[in-house]
């Protein structure tokens, strides 16, 4: 907390005394010294700017500390950001280790050819399960083409380095969320030096990034760093976001890397700090039950109230019900087949048998379902888990077997349990207990190729509108073809205009194309905007009792 107050106090001086050189816009003055960016034609980039001290040595498993080094030479801001160290499931081969432990940076992208002297700001928190990915995983050429917004991408600690927790004050966890928070403070205090408007900051994220954004909003002081927020296909109530069972995983991690003698959190933390980061991160493979399931063995937790600088010390449901969260305009979204992100891997044909993994669910459903659907640690007995697994299977598949032919029913189950239901519950709770506008949209417009085809490694299946089909119209991604259809081009431009208008709105209104979003606060029903290739329309759903 002291660090945040110090930054906010110093920020007033920084904003008034720091600015880019009008004669050389690539040269920017910061409190740490001068930096030089890159000219990319229609925008300038200033990449890999440190916002925190390297989280190594004694600073590993600690809250991030503001970066305070002074540059004697001009800082080279032309190098792309490194990945935070991770065990990347999408790397081929046995060694999936990537990235560096010293990785806490932001990258700033500023329009070049524009009549504006200053720009509103979009801060992006990247996704991918709190385990891998990075600030450079999504492109930004499409985003920058309109020339209306500054984009800032945030890197933060991932996996066990970012989220291991013993559930007490000694190894509290949520270090990745605390990184994000410090990065947002850095943006608030320094973005004016790049021509940004610190009073007009919109924070967005997709998937784990969306869940992160919502968790940031659930801090009352979020309004000090941002004006509004959007969570795409991820929010704090999704069952894969806030985890239980962290203490057991923390000590299991210790056992794997040679800290098995530790019987308390202090000893475990000290031992883990002495181990190579590569060993800690590589241990992730030991937590996978099959393929890369569970997707998120290490993620956000509810911290002990005694933890120093706790990020959250209550469950998000309780925070929302208390009304003690940031009263800023917030939007949340999902796609009609969001669950394809978790289900599509089951359609990959196995090299050993030539059959799809989904067939094995017929014999392994009770073993695998709790990990696939993230209720393994939320139920106390095997009987409870088996009863719930049986109920889910009966509700969505009846007596039919798991197969390629029944895949869509399984995908619908995954969408409902992991995304749709929790999004609507979150929307309803904000409607009842919030004061600022709350919006939602559901996206239904399948990409020609998307994350479903990428995970299943096949193109003969129609996956529908899966995870990312909307977000990747804003930020291009390698999993989908770069050339947009004519309908996607229109939607893409409407999304970009939506972001621009939302951050500039004085009363928190939100619109997409010709459709105005309906505010859920004060409404007797849930209000969602449906976006398809044919346009948009408002939907009303019954609220929860």
UniProtKB/Swiss-Prot annotation:
Family of the protein in this entry: Belongs to the type-B carboxylesterase/lipase family.
Catalytic activity: a carboxylic ester + H2O = an alcohol + a carboxylate + H(+)
Keyword terms: Disulfide bond, Glycoprotein, Hydrolase, Secreted, Serine esterase, Signal
PANTHER family: CARBOXYLIC ESTER HYDROLASE
Predominant location category: secreted
Complex and partners: Homodimer.
Active-site residues, as the UniProt record annotates them: 207 (acyl-ester intermediate), 467 (charge relay system)
Organism whose genome encodes this protein: Drosophila miranda
GO molecular function, one term: carboxylesterase activity
Signal peptide extent: 1-19
Disulfide bond annotation, renumbered to this chain: 84-103, 259-271, 515-536
Protein name as annotated: Esterase-5B
Keyword Disulfide bond: yes
Gene3D superfamilies per record: alpha/beta hydrolase (3.40.50.1820)
Glycosylated residue positions: 113, 421, 507
Enzyme class (EC, first level): hydrolase
Coiled coil segments of this chain: none
Record-listed E.C. numbers: 3.1.1.1
